[in-house]
Protein backbone atom coordinates (compact mmCIF):
# COMPACT_ATOMS: atom_id res chain seq x y z
CA UNK A 1 0.00 0.00 0.00
CA UNK A 2 1.42 3.40 -0.89
CA UNK A 3 1.81 6.05 1.79
CA UNK A 4 -0.92 8.27 0.31
CA UNK A 5 -3.42 5.39 0.25
CA UNK A 6 -2.44 4.49 3.82
CA UNK A 7 -2.97 8.08 4.95
CA UNK A 8 -6.35 8.36 3.21
CA UNK A 9 -7.46 5.19 5.00
CA UNK A 10 -6.11 6.49 8.31
CA UNK A 11 -7.99 9.79 7.92
CA UNK A 12 -11.28 7.92 7.63
CA UNK A 13 -10.57 6.27 10.99
CA UNK A 14 -9.91 9.51 12.92
CA UNK A 15 -12.47 9.67 15.77
CA UNK A 16 -12.33 13.46 16.10
CA UNK A 17 -12.40 13.82 12.34
CA UNK A 18 -15.60 11.80 12.22
CA UNK A 19 -17.09 13.91 15.01
CA UNK A 20 -16.24 17.05 13.03
CA UNK A 21 -17.55 15.43 9.81
CA UNK A 22 -14.19 16.33 8.27
CA UNK A 23 -13.36 15.30 4.72
CA UNK A 24 -9.90 14.89 3.24
CA UNK A 25 -10.46 16.56 -0.13
CA UNK A 26 -6.87 16.65 -1.39
CA UNK A 27 -3.79 14.69 -0.38
CA UNK A 28 -0.56 14.90 -2.31
CA UNK A 29 3.11 15.23 -1.50
CA UNK A 30 3.43 18.11 0.94
CA UNK A 31 -0.16 19.32 0.60
CA UNK A 32 -3.55 18.49 2.08
CA UNK A 33 -6.99 20.09 2.06
CA UNK A 34 -9.49 19.24 4.80
CA UNK A 35 -13.06 20.55 4.89
CA UNK A 36 -15.62 20.39 7.69
CA UNK A 37 -19.05 21.92 8.20
CA UNK A 38 -19.37 24.57 10.88
CA UNK A 39 -22.48 23.07 12.44
CA UNK A 40 -24.47 24.71 15.24
CA UNK A 41 -22.91 22.40 17.84
CA UNK A 42 -19.48 23.88 17.03
CA UNK A 43 -20.52 27.49 17.61
CA UNK A 44 -20.03 29.79 20.55
CA UNK A 45 -23.07 31.68 21.85
CA UNK A 46 -22.47 34.50 19.35
CA UNK A 47 -23.05 32.12 16.42
CA UNK A 48 -19.49 31.81 15.12
CA UNK A 49 -17.22 28.77 15.05
CA UNK A 50 -15.21 28.25 18.22
CA UNK A 51 -11.47 28.86 17.71
CA UNK A 52 -10.44 25.42 18.91
CA UNK A 53 -12.63 23.81 16.25
CA UNK A 54 -11.02 25.92 13.52
CA UNK A 55 -7.62 24.99 14.94
CA UNK A 56 -8.52 21.29 14.89
CA UNK A 57 -9.46 21.44 11.19
CA UNK A 58 -6.24 23.33 10.42
CA UNK A 59 -4.25 20.78 12.42
CA UNK A 60 -5.77 17.86 10.50
CA UNK A 61 -4.81 19.42 7.17
CA UNK A 62 -1.32 20.23 8.44
CA UNK A 63 -0.53 16.84 9.94
CA UNK A 64 -1.68 14.98 6.84
CA UNK A 65 0.43 17.25 4.61
CA UNK A 66 3.37 16.65 6.96
CA UNK A 67 2.87 12.88 7.13
CA UNK A 68 3.29 12.65 3.35
CA UNK A 69 6.96 13.43 4.00
CA UNK A 70 7.68 10.39 6.19
CA UNK A 71 7.47 6.72 5.19
CA UNK A 72 5.54 5.61 8.29
CA UNK A 73 4.23 6.71 11.65
CA UNK A 74 2.44 9.74 12.94
CA UNK A 75 3.82 13.16 13.76
CA UNK A 76 3.01 15.03 16.97
CA UNK A 77 2.48 18.77 16.76
CA UNK A 78 5.03 20.55 18.92
CA UNK A 79 3.96 24.11 18.20
CA UNK A 80 0.77 25.64 16.82
CA UNK A 81 0.29 29.32 16.06
CA UNK A 82 -3.09 30.46 14.74
CA UNK A 83 -4.27 33.92 13.78
CA UNK A 84 -8.04 34.30 13.44
CA UNK A 85 -8.85 36.93 10.82
CA UNK A 86 -12.61 36.68 10.25
CA UNK A 87 -15.42 34.70 11.87
CA UNK A 88 -16.80 31.51 10.38
CA UNK A 89 -20.57 31.43 10.70
CA UNK A 90 -22.93 28.54 11.34
CA UNK A 91 -23.54 26.49 8.23
CA UNK A 92 -20.34 27.53 6.48
CA UNK A 93 -17.74 25.01 5.41
CA UNK A 94 -14.30 25.44 6.94
CA UNK A 95 -11.70 24.53 4.31
CA UNK A 96 -8.09 24.27 5.49
CA UNK A 97 -5.30 24.02 2.93
CA UNK A 98 -1.91 23.05 4.34
CA UNK A 99 1.46 23.05 2.63
CA UNK A 100 4.83 21.88 3.87
CA UNK A 101 7.15 24.90 3.92
CA UNK A 102 10.17 23.28 5.58
CA UNK A 103 11.22 19.65 5.87
CA UNK A 104 14.35 18.92 7.90
CA UNK A 105 15.81 15.80 9.46
CA UNK A 106 13.84 16.18 12.70
CA UNK A 107 10.81 18.35 11.93
CA UNK A 108 8.30 19.50 9.35
CA UNK A 109 6.83 23.01 9.29
CA UNK A 110 3.48 23.64 7.63
CA UNK A 111 1.56 26.75 6.65
CA UNK A 112 -2.24 26.58 6.68
CA UNK A 113 -4.92 28.85 5.25
CA UNK A 114 -8.51 28.39 6.42
CA UNK A 115 -11.24 29.81 4.20
CA UNK A 116 -15.01 29.94 4.40
CA UNK A 117 -17.69 29.53 1.75
CA UNK A 118 -17.09 33.07 0.51
CA UNK A 119 -13.46 32.20 -0.29
CA UNK A 120 -12.19 34.79 2.16
CA UNK A 121 -9.27 33.99 4.42
CA UNK A 122 -10.63 33.27 7.92
CA UNK A 123 -7.50 32.05 9.73
CA UNK A 124 -3.84 31.33 9.08
CA UNK A 125 -1.68 28.90 11.01
CA UNK A 126 1.89 27.73 11.25
CA UNK A 127 2.20 24.25 12.71
CA UNK A 128 5.47 22.49 13.54
CA UNK A 129 5.63 18.68 13.75
CA UNK A 130 8.32 16.38 15.11
CA UNK A 131 9.35 13.59 12.77
CA UNK A 132 9.18 10.05 14.14
CA UNK A 133 12.42 8.54 15.41
CA UNK A 134 14.13 6.36 12.86
Where are these regions (language model features)?
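HotDog/MaoC-like acyl-thioester-processing domains
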Residues: 1, 71, 88-95, 99-134
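Non-catalytic linker/capping segments at the edges of enzyme domains
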Residues: 1-35, 39-41
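Short coil/loop residues immediately preceding or within conserved phosphate-binding loops
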Residues: 19, 79, 107-109
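A short interface-forming secondary-structure element
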Residues: 38-50, 54
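Short, charged/polar surface micro-motifs in flexible loops or helix N-caps
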Residues: 39-42, 60-61, 90
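A short coil-to-beta-strand element that immediately follows conserved catalytic motifs
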Residues: 74-77
